[in-house]
Amino acid sequence: MGSPHLQPCPGARTGFVFICPGRFEASRGYPCAAGTGANLARVLLALHERLPAFFPSPARDKYVITNSWDKVEYPALTQRSVPTLDEVLGAANLERLAAEIGRLDAVVACGAHAHAAVRALADRGSIQARLAFGRHLSQRAVNMIPGASDTPGRIGVWCDGVVAQLLQQG
């Protein structure tokens, strides 16, 4: 069973790491709810078409989806929307994340905090997966992707980057 920070998927080969659960994740009980979840659905459709060896399904329940920080953060609850980098890189937190993604063949890190956590795990040898790094999939972050003028185009650019990174490590 999942939680606001983690959607486990026994047998999955690929996973996504985001920053932390927020109020929508807390109320719905699973990671990447609301706008981020809608963009993740768009990404999964595109990645499944482009690289089915790593993305065998467009369905989100076929992937591990987790966060670099497992605690819910949003201003009305915690007076902030993200953890500190020191919290994300803390030993206990990295051990938790390694347990969640350590057996995957491919990991896509979404957002700066996720990048830092996944790089730290790779540097320590805690994960041996192929790694890709992209912007967070919040609508605000997607709107900042250069090279396209609308959400579908920006999602395409994002997916191109992920595919290129994963294939480069072959």
Spans of model-derived segments:
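Short, flexible coil/linker elements and helix-boundary hinge sites characteristic
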Residues: 125-126, 170
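A polyanion-binding, active-site-adjacent surface
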Residues: 1-120, 129-132, 139
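Basic, amphipathic N-terminal segments that precede the first structured/catalytic domain
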Residues: 1, 163-170
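Generic hydrophobic alpha-helical segments
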Residues: 90-97, 155-158, 162-166
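Short, flexible loop segments at boundaries between secondary-structure elements
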Residues: 49-51, 126-163
